[in-house]
């Protein structure tokens, strides 16, 4: 293990509150700039901006008093920690560190884009609370990310989702007040998208956020996720592994990291059963959140150096192993990303390198899915001891 591994990789910022304010500031400062401008003509020194900002436009009483209290739930988004994988990574010649998006306020990486897409549309004057009806197709996590932001800002939200997604997703979405329309699971995300467009056309004052094509999706990862990984690894990351759903995470994060170091390798993950990025055909699979069955507009394939295929069964088994061996309760797509990272970590040419892997969502929202089916059935059969 490389010598730097022995030292904790801590943030340059003093408090989580400080870092979360910066998440909010960096997004607002960039609203008027297109993603291409951020990536091209304007050079943004993200490590210094993200870590050492010393002023904010206005300060609440809690900030003035020095209390470490967020002003609202949106300030809790981002700045998630990284942790090394240990037992499960035995046999790897590289070191693997997971970016724990499971520790977002609503437990998934989609909290970032739920916030960014709504704020971006507000700043452009396209939506307003109490008037606009937000509409979006989702596999669940983006819907949840939108639902808690919509609830906190006063929007009505209508979501379309394939009926194959977990029961927990339905419950959470409705708990936040979202209206949920289930679609034919055989049609996958394409069916959910089609239904959302139908609702949009028949609903007054409706606005669709279009996570698969909205530039605010990859932009927030370029502004926050990428800089966070770069900062927390002290720029020592060699390889990034991430699943491909909307394409936002891998595009925005990968683009930022490659700007810092062009030698960093960006590796995407897709289901074997729906391997469209590898030249295959779309098909049903069990890895919720990735493998939409089409190439999303937000995905910049030029950012990626490689795409690895992981089967549903492999992803499920790896996610279960992460809970048992690492104490990390994660979703199926995290299992897919972890296995891909482990495969890359065993390649001889990667000896001593640092691999970052994104764990997109928390496992508790998969309790009714195949991921924990055997455990659930066992628990349902349990009887009290008399």
From Swiss-Prot:
It holds the Pfam family PALP. The keyword Chloroplast applies. Keywords: Amino-acid biosynthesis, Chloroplast, Chromoplast, Cysteine biosynthesis, Plastid, Pyridoxal phosphate, Transferase, Transit peptide. Pyridoxal 5'-phosphate binds at residues 141, 245-249, 333. GO terms for molecular function: cysteine synthase activity. Its cofactor is pyridoxal 5'-phosphate. It catalyses: O-acetyl-L-serine + hydrogen sulfide = L-cysteine + acetate. Pathway: Amino-acid biosynthesis; L-cysteine biosynthesis; L-cysteine from L-serine: step 2/2. InterPro entries: Cys_synth, Cys_Synth/Cystath_Beta-Synth, CysK, P-phosphate_BS, TrpB-like_PALP, TrpB-like_PALP_sf. The keyword Transferase applies. Its main location: plastid. The modification N6-(pyridoxal phosphate)lysine is found at residue 110. Residues 1-52 form a transit peptide. One of its GO terms (cellular component) is cytoplasm. One of its GO terms (biological process) is cysteine biosynthetic process from serine. Its EC number is 2.5.1.47. It is found in: Plastid, Chloroplast stroma; Plastid, Chromoplast. Belongs to the cysteine synthase/cystathionine beta-synthase family. Homodimer. This is Cysteine synthase, chloroplastic/chromoplastic. It comes from Solanum tuberosum.
């Amino acid at each position: 293990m490389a010598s730097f591994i022995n030292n904790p990789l801590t943030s340059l910022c003093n408090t989580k509150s400080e870092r979360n304010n910066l998440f909010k500031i960096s997004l607002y400062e960039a609203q008027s700039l297109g993603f291409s401008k951020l990536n091209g003509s304007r050079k943004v020194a993200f490590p210094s901006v993200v870590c050492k900002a010393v002023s904010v436009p206005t300060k609440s009483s809690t900030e003035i008093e020095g209390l470490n209290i967020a002003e609202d739930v949106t300030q809790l988004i981002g700045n998630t920690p990284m942790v090394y994988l240990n037992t499960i990574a035995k046999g790897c010649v590289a070191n693997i560190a997971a970016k724990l998006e499971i520790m977002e306020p609503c437990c998934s990486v989609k909290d970032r884009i739920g916030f960014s897409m709504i704020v971006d549309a507000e700043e452009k004057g396209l939506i307003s609370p109490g008037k606009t009806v937000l509409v979006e197709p989702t596999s669940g996590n983006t819907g949840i990310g939108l639902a808690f932001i919509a609830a906190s800002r006063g929007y009505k939200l209508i979501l379309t989702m394939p009926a194959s997604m977990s029961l927990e997703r339905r419950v959470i979405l409705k708990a936040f007040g979202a209206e949920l329309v289930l679609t034919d699971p055989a049609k996958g995300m394409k069916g959910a998208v089609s239904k959302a467009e139908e609702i949009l056309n028949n609903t007054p004052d409706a606005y669709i956020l279009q996570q698969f094509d909205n530039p605010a999706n990859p932009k927030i990862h370029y502004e926050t996720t990428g800089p966070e990984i770069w900062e927390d690894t002290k720029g020592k990351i060699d390889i990034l592994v991430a699943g491909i759903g909307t394409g936002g995470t891998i595009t925005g994060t990968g683009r930022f990291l490659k700007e810092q170091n062009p030698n960093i390798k960006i590796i995407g993950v897709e289901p074997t059963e729906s391997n469209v990025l590898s030249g295959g055909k779309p098909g049903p699979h069990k890895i919720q959140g990735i493998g939409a069955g089409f190439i999303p507009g937000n995905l910049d394939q030029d950012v990626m150096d490689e795409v690895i295929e992981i089967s549903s069964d492999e992803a499920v088994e790896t996610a279960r192993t992460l809970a048992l061996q690492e104490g990390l309760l994660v979703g199926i797509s995290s299992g897919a990303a972890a296995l891909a990272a482990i495969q890359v970590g065993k390649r001889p040419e990667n000896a001593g390198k640092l691999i970052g892997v994104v764990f997109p969502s928390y496992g508790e929202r998969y309790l009714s899915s195949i991921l924990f089916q055997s455990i659930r059935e066992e628990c349902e059969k349990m009887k009290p001891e008399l």
